């Protein structure tokens, strides 16, 4: 992609409903962070420039990010996470797995508490992808290892536990084991911050006494606050 093509896409994004400031893309094609940021916007459904987003995300894979700066580590991991998601949509599962692994490696390489990405969510992306690739047993083993490593740590809001138990709940639901699915989802919810205004909706969702586990989990998800908007300790 040329600088001219890059700047045309910047203005396309700036004219969209998102309306990001132009300085977000300072440095143009010479800046991996500018390329990653533009790619995120291009990948949005309302802009739908997935091919261009894919090209820009791929250009970031070999970026020389500064491991001492949390914002750079986070931005790099977030870009690889989104690239993996795009590749998963395209059925390119091996490439998607490689890139989510790279995102996890980057995020886990430091002790930073990130602002926008969650370590547990990165792992969940990997587990869901393994499940999609019929490697569910491998995913379950990793989930159990994460839960065992973190379940007794005195940390109240733990993304590893939330996403780990949630994954186990989804598997139980797919297998038709409703009570087990609900139990795991209770454990998942216990690992996250739940503002008071969400309590009634969650109680109602969990109170369902039928055997459609997938429906119950969908209702629980609807009643659960967006994890991106909550405080996490890890």
What are these regions (language model features)?
Residues 42-44, 80, 87, 123, ...:
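Residue at a conserved register position within TPR or TPR-like alpha-solenoid repeats
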Residues 45-47, 90, 133, 168, ...:
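Structural motif corresponding to the intra-repeat A-B loop/turn of tetratricopeptide repeats
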Residues 3-20, 29, 33-48:
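Alpha-helical segment of the N-proximal tetratricopeptide repeat
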Residues 197-234:
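Terminal, low-structured helical/coil segments at or just beyond the last alpha-helical repeat
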Residues 19-30, 60-74, 105-119, 148-158, ...:
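Flexible helix-coil transition and linker loops at the boundaries of alpha-helical arrays
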């Amino acid at each position: 992609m040329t600088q001219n093509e890059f700047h045309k896409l910047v203005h396309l994004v700036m004219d969209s409903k998102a309306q990001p400031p132009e300085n977000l893309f300072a440095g143009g094609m010479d800046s991996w962070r500018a390329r990653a940021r533009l790619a995120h916007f291009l990948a949005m459904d309302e802009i739908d420039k997935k091919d261009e987003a894919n090209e820009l995300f791929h250009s970031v894979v070999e970026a020389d990010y500064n491991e001492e700066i949390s914002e750079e580590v986070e931005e790099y991991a977030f870009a690889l996470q989104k690239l993996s998601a795009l590749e998963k949509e395209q059925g390119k599962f091996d490439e998607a797995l490689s890139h989510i692994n790279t995102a996890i490696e980057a995020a886990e390489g430091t002790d930073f508490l990130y602002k926008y990405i969650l370590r547990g969510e990165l792992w969940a992306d990997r587990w869901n992808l393994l499940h999609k690739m019929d490697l569910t047993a491998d995913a379950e083993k990793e989930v159990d290892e994460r839960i065992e490593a973190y379940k007794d740590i005195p940390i109240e809001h733990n993304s590893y536990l939330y996403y780990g138990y949630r994954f186990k709940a989804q598997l139980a639901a797919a297998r038709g084991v409703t009570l087990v699915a609900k139990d795991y989802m209770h454990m998942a919810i216990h690992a996250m911050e739940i503002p008071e205004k969400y309590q009634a909706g969650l109680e109602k969702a969990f109170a369902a006494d039928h055997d459609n586990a997938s429906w119950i989990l969908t209702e629980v998800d609807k009643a659960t606050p967006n994890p991106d908007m909550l405080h996490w300790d890890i």
